[in-house]
Amino acid sequence: AGRNVHPIAVSGQFQLGGITVTTGSCGHAWGGVWFHLDVADGLFYSGDISMESALFRFDVPPPAGLALVDASYGLYNVSQRQQWDKLRARLTLPALCPVPPSGRAVELALLLAREGRTDIALDAPCLEMLRQMAAHNDGSLHQDVEAELQQLLRTLPAFSAQSSLILAADPDGQSGMAGELRRRKDFHHRTLFTGHMNRLNHQQWLAGEVDFCRWNVHPTLKTLMLLVSMLKCSRLVPMFTHVEDIQDWQFAPGCHIVTQNMLRVDLCH
C-alpha cells in the first residue's frame, strides 16, 4: 500500500524525473531489460545481457558515451555454438540440470526438441514459464519461436523422475524440485550445472560429484566488442568481474576502460 509502481515495457520508453529512459530486451531471460538514459552523451546500463540466445532477443541500444556493461565472464571467449556441442555430449546419459525457470530451462528444452529429443521433463515452475512464453511474447522472445513453443508445450511428456533429461528449479540444485530429487536415495541421474555454482556446488564439482558445462547467458569477449561497436561508447565499465590488468581489457580503439573504483571517484567529484 502507498507504493507508486508503474510497469515498464520490455522495449519502450518512460520518463524518470525529466530524463528519457529507453528499455530493450537484454537477451538473458524472460522480461529482462537493459536501460539507456538520455543524459549528456548517453548512459547505458546493461544488467545481465546475452546476444547468443536462440530464444531471447537482444534489442540494439542507442549510442551512449558511458556504458556500464555485464562482464560476468571476464575475457572468456568461447561461443555458444562451441558450448552447445560440449553440452549435447553431456546430455546422452540420464542427467538433472538445475536451471532458472525464466532463463535457460525453456531454451534448452527448445533446442533439444529441435533435435528430436522427446525424453525431456520440465518441473512445474519451468513448465509454467513455457506456458507463459507460448501464450504471449512480452517482447523478450525472438519473433519466430512462438509456434515452436506452442508445439513443445503440446508434446512434452508429463513430469517423471525417470525421464532421461530433467530440467528443474532451483538453479542452485539445493532447493526446489532439483534439490528434492538430489536428496532422494533412489534418484541416480548425474547432476549437470550449466550456470553459476555456489561454493558448495563448486566443491562438489572439484570432488567429481557433479558436472559442469557452461551455457552462455552473459557476454563473451566477442559480444563485448560488438556491444562497444553498437554503443560507440568512449568509456566502458566492466561489471560483475574483477579487472586484474586493465591493459588486457583495451580491446576497442577509442574506448577507455573504467574500473568501478575509478568510476566511484569520478562520480564523487
Tell where the protein language model's regions lie, with residue ranges:
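Core dinuclear metal-dependent hydrolase active-site scaffold
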Residues: 9-56, 151-181, 219-226, 263-269
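His/Asp/Glu-rich metal-coordinating catalytic cores
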Residues: 1-104, 110-119, 144
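Active-site regions of enzymes building and remodeling cell-envelope glycoconjugates
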Residues: 2-8, 18-21, 65-67, 138-151, ...
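Binuclear metal-ion centers of metallo-dependent hydrolases, dominated by the metallo-beta-lactamase
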Residues: 80-147, 226-269
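His/Asp/Glu-enriched, well-ordered alpha-helical/loop segment
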Residues: 208-234
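Short, conserved loop/helix-junction motifs that constitute active-site signature segments
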Residues: 60-63, 115, 181-188, 228-232
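Redox- and metal-dependent alpha/beta enzyme cores, enriched for Fe-S-associated oxidoreductases
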Residues: 177-209
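Active-site metal-binding loops of divalent metal-dependent hydrolases
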Residues: 26-29, 47-49, 71-73, 100-102, ...
